[in-house]
Amino acid sequence: MKQKRLLRRDGFTFKQFFVGHDRCAMKVGTDGVLLGAWTPVSDKKAILDIGCGSGLIALMLAQRTDENTKIDAVELDTEAALQAQDNAEQSPWQRKIDVYQQDIGDFAEQYSQCYDLIVSNPPYFEPAVACRNEAREQARYTGSMTHQQLLQYAETLITADGLFCVVLPYAIGEEFETMACHQGWFSHHRVNIRDRQGKPLHRMLLAFSRKEKTGLISELTIRQPDGAYTQEFQQLVTDFYLYY
């Protein structure tokens, strides 16, 4: 009988790499995994991860792209950036990933490179009652970077043919899509996601382009009514999750 190996508790073990997240405010979660597994990467050679946290999405994209692809990962929080750097250095793709501990606005002003793929799992709570943990507040609340600012930074840093991909809660994703269209973006692909069959839509994956085109809309369900992962979700994460 095949036995499951003993896994580390300070992070998340994938098939080809480990993501430590004990020094990060936001832990490895389904949102980041969805974005990292779904984002279109064909022919992408220069990738930017805005607000990379532990480096999860950057690492997933490194696994999915060829050795000539370069990935820049920008993170404001010092401890999270250090952990993302450690995770990259301990992965098979150390040479592909550079981590910058920097505000994305400062990064956009300092570097002239443009990217053919930009990804972000952005904060989505509006500032209200202050969080007791400053790092967690940065990761979860839009006070340090609004969605309008994120769209503006992406516009500055993307190539003419590039894609900008995000994951957001469903209702906030609808607002984000409307805002993006008002700022001159075009919806390239939208995936409406429900956590379980029969439940309301819960998340949204979005891919935008600066070029006009007819957008594709599809749907993904993560779990069956009995809680087991659906076949479509297993197929999406099969290169990453253990035991699939």
Curated annotation (Swiss-Prot):
Coiled coil: none annotated. Gene3D superfamilies: Vaccinia Virus protein VP39. It is found in: Cytoplasm. It catalyses: adenosine(37) in tRNA1(Val) + S-adenosyl-L-methionine = N(6)-methyladenosine(37) in tRNA1(Val) + S-adenosyl-L-homocysteine + H(+). One of its GO terms (molecular function) is tRNA (adenine-N6)-methyltransferase activity. It comes from the Bacteria. SUPFAM superfamilies: S-adenosyl-L-methionine-dependent methyltransferases. Its main location: cytoplasm. Its EC number is 2.1.1.223. The keyword Ribonucleoprotein does not apply. PANTHER family: TRNA1(VAL) (ADENINE(37)-N6)-METHYLTRANSFERASE. NCBIfam families: tRm6a37MtseTrmN (NF047853). Belongs to the methyltransferase superfamily. tRNA (adenine-N(6)-)-methyltransferase family. Specifically methylates the adenine in position 37 of tRNA(1)(Val) (anticodon cmo5UAC). This is tRNA1(Val) (adenine(37)-N6)-methyltransferase. It comes from Photorhabdus laumondii subsp. laumondii (strain DSM 15139 / CIP 105565 / TT01).
